[in-house]
Amino acid sequence: IFMSQQYPFQCNIAQALNIIGDKWSLLILHGIMSGHQTYKEIYNSLEGQIASNLLSSRLKALEADGLISSDLYQKHPPRYRYTLTPAGEDLNIVFNSLVLWGEKHLTTCYKRLIHKNCNHTVETHYYCPHCQQTVAEDQLAVVAAEEKEHQHE
């Protein structure tokens, strides 16, 4: 929505980036996920680094794209509380993956993703609910969506 050009590719990554790939959207969503629900709280969570008109337009676009919902909690002046929709909540795994990637590859690591019980870093794994098994990375394949129906069981 915000990029001057949209990715035209028939690719989940490209189409997801068309929705959340601008400079601010993921940070706004992460702020909401972290409990910052009002405009002022979201703005402050971004340390005032975003122009207010840009934040307003991003919030409207994220709502139009079905990632957040708004609830009017004050009429004069109108003020909204923002919450994640189920589609927005599904980005939590993306945020966690970015934290893990950052811990491994950034020169300065700011956050870690840990298991609360033992305080050690976790790893990501893939699970097949059909087979009820953890799946190794070398056993994964990305296939065209229509091919999903033709896979053997």
Please give the residue ranges for each predicted region:
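C-terminal regulatory/oligomerization modules of transcriptional regulators
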Residues: L100-E153
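Short, Lys/Arg-enriched N-terminal segment that forms or immediately precedes the first helix
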Residues: F2-L17
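Alpha-helical linker/hinge and terminal dimerization helices associated
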Residues: L26, D65, V94-H105
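Residues within the helices of the helix-turn-helix
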Residues: K40, K60, Y80
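Canonical helix-turn-helix DNA-binding module
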Residues: L46-S70
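Basic, amphipathic "hinge/linker" alpha-helix immediately C-terminal to the N-terminal HTH DNA-binding motif
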Residues: G21, Q74-N96
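N-terminal helix-turn-helix DNA-binding core of bacterial DNA-binding proteins
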Residues: I13-L54
